[in-house]
Swiss-Prot record:
UniProt binding sites for Mg(2+) 1: D10, E48, D70
Protein name from the UniProt record: Ribonuclease H
HAMAP family: RNase_H (MF_00042)
Functional note: Endonuclease that specifically degrades the RNA of RNA-DNA hybrids.
Disulfide pairings: none
InterPro entries listed in its UniProt record: RNase_H, RNaseH-like_sf, RNaseH_domain, RNaseH_sf, RNaseHI
Positions of Mg(2+) 2 binding: D10, D135
Record's catalysed reaction(s): Endonucleolytic cleavage to 5'-phosphomonoester
Tree of life domain: Bacteria
Source organism of the structure: Chlorobaculum parvum (strain DSM 263 / NCIMB 8327)
Gene name as annotated: rnhA
Subcellular location: Cytoplasm
Length: 146
């Protein structure tokens, strides 16, 4: 039987572009795993995406995933058909410009083929303890490298 994993993710940037960090919380039953990382020169959107990528990569087998993010960029691309249109249009936006962060979108395509992922938008910097913890992990990753 396929496991259902709950994942919360967040990215942060000190300057945009600037130093960035990402954090993720993976939960299955009573088990929790926290992961985070750092990039010395990045953007907030890239860190939001990297959090989702690294969390999905951490799964040891194909799973059903409920992924929660405060990134409208990430969630809308997945839920409003942006990603499908970009693929259909050869990685071009509706205005015929190249899609930004194509390298990370290609990773997300691979990972969402392996796992059955449902993306959920949560309000950032609010009362969601899991999203707040991911924000803390992302900011700590920046602080520890600075």
């Amino acid at each position: 039987m396929e496991k259902t994993i709950t994942i919360y993710t967040d990215g942060a940037c000190s300057g945009n572009p600037g130093k960035g960090g990402w954090g993720a919380l993976l939960m299955y039953g009573n088990t929790r795993k926290e992961i985070s990382g750092y990039d010395p020169a990045t953007t907030n959107n890239r860190m939001e995406m990297m959090a989702a990528i690294r969390a999905l990569e951490a799964l040891k087998e194909p799973c059903r995933v409920e992924l929660y993010s405060d990134s409208a960029y990430l969630v809308n691309a997945m839920n409003q058909g942006w990603l499908k249109r970009w693929l259909k249009n050869g990685w071009k936006t509706a205005s015929k410009k190249p899609v930004e962060n194509i390298d990370l979108w290609q990773e997300i395509v691979k990972l969402t083929t392996l796992h059955r992922v449902t993306f959920h938008k949560v309000k950032g910097h609010s009362d969601n303890q899991y999203n707040n913890r991911c924000d803390e992990l992302a900011r700590l990753a920046i602080k520890e490298q600075s």
